[in-house]
Amino acid sequence: MNNQKYIRNFSIIAHIDHGKSTLADRLIEHCGGLNAREMSQQVLDSMDIEKERGITIKAQTVRLVYKAKNGNTYYLNLMDTPGHVDFSYEVSRSLAACEGSLLVVDSTQGVEAQTLANVYQAIANDHEIVPVLNKIDLAASEPEHVKKQIEDIIGIDASEAVLISAKNGIGIDSVLEAIINKLPSPKESSTDTLKALLVDSWYDPYLGVVILVRIIDGTLRKNMRVKMIGTNSVYTVEHVGFFTPKKHISDVLYAGEIGFFTASIKRVSDCKVGDTITDEKKSCEQALPGFKPNIPVVFCGFYPTDSAEFEHLKDSLAKLRLNDASFEYEMESSSALGVGFRCGFLGLLHLEIIQERLSREFNLDLITTAPSVIYKIYMLDGESLEIHNPADLPDLQKIASMEEPWIKATIMVPDEFIGTVLSLCKEKRGIQLDHSYISNRAKIVYKLPLNEIVYDFYDRLKSCSKGYASFEWQMDVYELSDLVNLRILVNGEVVDALSTIVHRSRAEQRGRALCVRLKDLIPRQQIDIAIQASVGNRIIARETIKALRKDVLSKCYGGDISRKRKLLEKQKAGKKKMRQYGNIEIPQSAFIAALQIGGE
């Protein structure tokens, strides 16, 4: 489409479960992107894991053709975005490729914490925002009340908000007309020189790397020689196209359009999300600003259960990194687990999803170590360090001070659950910053240590509020803290994979909980097994797995007592040798247990 006034690029932003993927389904259905036989729920949620969990993980794009009431045909490029805070990087990339957004709010629940986070990102990208109130067919729907909430909390005019029921297809025409009449078209191309933003990329086993682009200026054609400005790599374009949501091959993409191209790219490192793509012969003068990279805040180790799978894990992580630029990894080794990778994530759900994708898509069986965050260490000799692996923590005698990251959390909760939510935040060492009411819902702002959040905070928040509380957070500051390295010893040997950095006030509780759980998980041997938790040289918790007793006298039916004594002495000597040289095998379930002791 060469006339930009008939193009609209827009995102759908909303809190989890407010109906953005369902609305996307109805828009595709209404515009004839798929016929009735091909339609399925959550069309744009392409991964099985997305459909099973009912969440969007990857931002998806689709081109819709719509004949408006004014008689003109418009080309609508829709970017469906995730709602969970852990996938905010996906949201930011989608918003950078668009000029406007549909803000979908559940009219039975109102504005939630992650609605705020995503809408503020849209405002930062200078988006025109159209409020859409979903689920108006339900008896609990309160559209007028929610309109007032949007105006009071977000500060945008909601008087002309579109009322819809995405599930039943009510009001879809009104949404499409609002997109045409209220959202701006792309800016006119200022030059014929190709300038395109690399929005996303993924690996296709047949085509190599597939790149999703938003064309800012010029045109992208088949057989063009294009250059990635960030890496200076040059490729010949083989296929150009867009999604309807089926893959549709065309010969050209014009300014203002969103589409994909392939160029037999085999090196994953050449495709950096946010890079600028231009014509090799006639390069653009200035690169696009790209995206602000998201910094991982939660780290853990991935180790293959079979060491022969290491290379497969390495290749799999490279392919996933291409598809999800917000997680990072580097090689590390552990005396207990062998060689693996230290990986960084935007949150615990992000970690869980990556782990599940490695298992499903690449058939990998992994051991995952306990999650940790980045700590700042200041040494007595003036040196400063940043560590996220407890094994790298220097001797406490050489440390002058340590700082841990704190977050600013916004929690929206119905007023009947305020007491339990405040108790949970207090238990997690939280400091209350603000407490206000919007009708029957409370908005609580807390300052919380990230270390306390990465274990089980989200699950416990949902549990204590019966699923009604919503939670959004952002990094705040680093502050001095009394931190210690909690180490686990099995038969006197430190198991580095189970070490974790905790606040001194929580060390005994967490150490005791882990010792009790390991006692149930490690199989009994023919010797006593001591499981200990230590801070420095002090043992703070201990559990003992009692030995299995083998009856060596079972074959003796009487006779000289010296024969029995000889057998018992031999058994005693054998057990002494086992205590000295025996290795205790720790099952994988013990390492998984380390992820689940946060609230005990």
Curated annotation (Swiss-Prot):
Residues 5-187 form the tr-type G domain. GTP binds at D17, H18, G19, K20, S21, T22, N134, K135, I136, D137. Its EC number is 3.6.5.n1. GO terms for cellular component: plasma membrane. It comes from the Bacteria. GO terms for molecular function: GTP binding; GTPase activity; guanosine tetraphosphate binding; ribosome binding; translation elongation factor activity. Gene3D superfamilies: 3.30.70.240, Elongation factor 4, C-terminal domain, Elongation Factor G (Translational Gtpase), domain 3, P-loop containing nucleotide triphosphate hydrolases, Translation factors. It catalyses: GTP + H2O = GDP + phosphate + H(+). Keywords: Cell inner membrane, Cell membrane, GTP-binding, Hydrolase, Membrane, Nucleotide-binding, Protein biosynthesis. It is a peripheral membrane protein. SUPFAM superfamilies: EF-G C-terminal domain-like, P-loop containing nucleoside triphosphate hydrolases. GO terms for biological process: positive regulation of translation. Belongs to the TRAFAC class translation factor GTPase superfamily. Classic translation factor GTPase family. LepA subfamily. Required for accurate and efficient protein synthesis under certain stress conditions. May act as a fidelity factor of the translation reaction, by catalyzing a one-codon backward translocation of tRNAs on improperly translocated ribosomes. Back-translocation proceeds from a post-translocation (POST) complex to a pre-translocation (PRE) complex, thus giving elongation factor G a second chance to translocate the tRNAs correctly. Binds to ribosomes in a GTP-dependent manner. NCBIfam families: lepA (TIGR01393), small_GTP (TIGR00231). This is Elongation factor 4.
